[in-house]
Amino acid sequence: METKKIFVINGGQVFGHSGGRFNKTIFDTTRQFFNGKEGFEIRSTDINDEYDPKHEVENYVWADIVIYHTPIWWFQVPNGLKKYIDVVFTEGHQTGIYHSDGRSSQNPTVNYGTGGMLHGKQYMVTSSWNAPKEAFSLPGEFFNETSVDDGALFGFHRMNAFTGMKPLPGLHFHDVEKNANIVVDLERYTTHLNNIFINKEHEHLSNSNFQSQATAH
């Protein structure tokens, strides 16, 4: 059996009134899911802990699949996760994450975003929101019927595409402050992990429709 190498990143920053507990729970669930499972090796990083940028680059290069767990603060990832990406990806310039922006001075108008060094790898992202899922889907509601992946996480997805990685279907947790149900969320997430990594349902999804199916959860 081919071994899949999984690198898990907890972006649930402890800051202000946020204790980061929800994403830490999801992060721990991911590690527990893969630990001891035949066919998987796992490494993990919590952005709240000290990290060595060179070692983090090695983790990206080592991994077949990167899993990000992040809350959304003010419609963006937390500043601690953004700093982690800035520091680690800068360290990874020409050392494993990206070589260049892909363009040449001879023809600078084309091929932007094709200089990544992580081709052949995949990533998955989960996000947690105070906003209910209806805020994204109902006419007249706040997000103008724009999904998480096509809206707030659009830049995050393009960031990973810049490195050469391809997406796996993710999962988004809504209304986690005023209407949380952690038992249901964990059951739904474990089912998602089984579907993606054990049953491999994603292999039957086309690249054109994976995000719509992922955000429907």
Where are these regions (language model features)?
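Short, flexible coil/linker segments at domain boundaries that flank nucleotide/cofactor-interacting
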Residues: 1-2, 118
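Glycine-rich phosphate/pyrophosphate-binding loop and the adjoining helix
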Residues: 2, 23, 142-217
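N-terminal beta1-alpha1 ligand-phosphate binding loop
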Residues: 2-38, 202
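Short loop/turn segments at strand-loop or loop-helix junctions that form parts
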Residues: 8-12, 127-131, 171-174
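Residues at alpha-helix caps and immediate loop-helix transition turns in enzyme cores, especially N-
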Residues: 19-23, 55, 77-81, 181, ...
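A structural motif corresponding to the C-terminal end of an alpha-helix
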Residues: 33-40, 115, 121, 159-168
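A short beta-strand-loop structural module common to alpha/beta enzyme folds
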Residues: 37-51, 171-174
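Helix-loop-strand module that forms the ligand-binding subsite of alpha/beta enzymes
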Residues: 52-156
